[in-house]
Amino acid sequence: MKLKEKIEAIRLRKLGKSYGEIRKKARVSKGTLSLWLRNIELTPGQEKRLYVELRQKNAYRMAKLNQRKRIDKTKKILKEAKKEVSSYFTNPLFLAGLMLYWAEGDKSEEDELVKFSNSDPAMIKLMMRWFGEICKVPEEKFRITLYIHELFCRKDIEKYWSKLTKIPLAQFHKTQVKPTSLRHRKNPLYNGTCAIRISNRDLFRRIKGWKLGFLEKINIRMKENNMPS
C-alpha cells in the first residue's frame, strides 16, 4: 500500500479538495482513492464549494463544446454555400440580391442577424424576391421594422410597406419615429426606411459563403483572362 500517498490524500480531502485535485498529488486510481476516502465527511461549506466548482467546470466544458460545434457547423455551411455559387452564377436575381446585400445588408457577426434596410421601394421588392426565391425564407419568418419622421402618418406608411412586401402588419415591429427635418417636410412621397429582418444564423452564414464563393469565382475568371486581381 502506498502509505505516504494515502496519508496525503486523506489530508487533502479533509481540507475539502475534490478527487480530481487529490489525484494530481497522489497518483493512484480513482477506485483506490474512493476506498481511502470513503469514511471522510466534508463540511457543508466544503460540499458547497465543490458543487459550485463542478457546475462552473461543466458550464465551461459545455460552452467550449458548443463553440466547437458552432465553428464546425459554420465551416460546413460556408463550404456548401461556396459550391452553390457555380449553379447560381448566371442567375440575375441571385447576383443582384447578393450585390445589394453585400452593399446594404447587415454584416455584423456579433448576432448574425440577416437584415437589409433601404428607403427605395424597388430595392425592397427585389430583396423580398431574393429572400423568398433564392434564400427560401418562408413568409412567416420575415419581420419588418420601419423608421419614419414624426410629421408623417405612421399607419399609412405601415400599410404602404405591408402591401409592398406582402408581409402582414402582425409581423411588423414597433415603428421607430424620429424628429422631422425641414428636408423631409417638403417630400410628399416620403415613406421612411424599411428594414427587413430574418432571424436565421444559418442563412447569415450561407450568404457569407455565397459572397466568398463569388469572389473566388471572379478571381479565377480574371486569372483565366490574364487580368490583375
Enumerate the predicted regions with their spans.
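Short, solvent-exposed alpha-helical "recognition" segments
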Residues: 1-2, 32-54
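C-terminal regulatory/effector modules of DNA-binding transcriptional regulators
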Residues: 138, 143, 148-229
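Short, amphipathic alpha-helical "recognition" segments used to contact nucleic acids or chromatin
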Residues: 2-17
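Residue-level detection of the helix-turn-helix DNA-binding "recognition helix"
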Residues: 14, 27, 38-42
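Short secondary-structure subsegments characteristic of cysteine-rich extracellular domains
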Residues: 109-134
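Structural motif
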Residues: 85-96
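Short alpha-helical "recognition helix" segments of helix-turn-helix
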Residues: 21-26
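Intrinsically disordered, low-complexity basic tails/linkers immediately adjacent to helix-turn-helix/homeobox/MYB/SANT
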Residues: 49-84
